[in-house]
């Protein structure tokens, strides 16, 4: 299972915005039935619940089982973390997402999202400009992150989203 040290290292990687793959080694040494892999992945996902974006791969370094897939996955994750998405394409995804689920309201005030742009890579970092950042609920931010992930993949990399009120002069 996931050790305390695994959890600490994973937490440091997550906080630092590093792309990650969760690799479970010594797969050859585990007694398996038809549900072993599924149960193990559920356990790993529960213990590292903040890393939902990280793929889980079961390998055996001793026998070489799935090691070739690991290198393909590393290439894929590195490319995803460095991906740049044009502002126009991002804003189409944003418009589609808002059409499916309207932005939240609070005491009659509706959140208006003006646009989104990417300001960094490794990890992908986006900034969303809106009328009132206080109206931007974390669940709607997570919804938009999931829409971006669903559209562009972004496997194995955290995604950063910063909310800015129009007229804010803060550093990005």
Describe the predicted segments one by one.
Residues 2-172:
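C-terminal-of-GTPase-core extension/linker across diverse P-loop GTPases
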């Amino acid at each position: 299972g996931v050790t305390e040290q695994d959890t600490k290292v994973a937490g440091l990687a997550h906080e630092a915005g590093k792309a990650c793959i969760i690799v479970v080694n010594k797969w050859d040494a585990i007694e398996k039935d038809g549900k072993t892999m599924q149960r193990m992945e559920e356990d790993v996902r529960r213990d590292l619940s903040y890393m939902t974006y990280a793929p889980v791969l079961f390998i055996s370094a001793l026998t070489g089982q799935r090691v070739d897939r690991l290198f393909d996955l590393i290439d894929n994750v590195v490319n995803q973390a460095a991906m740049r998405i044009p502002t126009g394409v991002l804003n189409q995804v944003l418009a589609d997402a808002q059409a499916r689920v309207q932005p939240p309201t609070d005491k009659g005030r509706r959140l208006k999202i003006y646009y989104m742009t990417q300001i960094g890579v490794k990890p992908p970092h986006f900034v969303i400009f809106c009328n009132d950042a206080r109206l931007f609920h974390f669940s709607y931010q997570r919804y938009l992150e999931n829409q971006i992930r669903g559209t562009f993949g972004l496997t194995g990399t955290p995604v950063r989203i910063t909310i800015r009120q129009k007229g804010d002069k803060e550093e990005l």
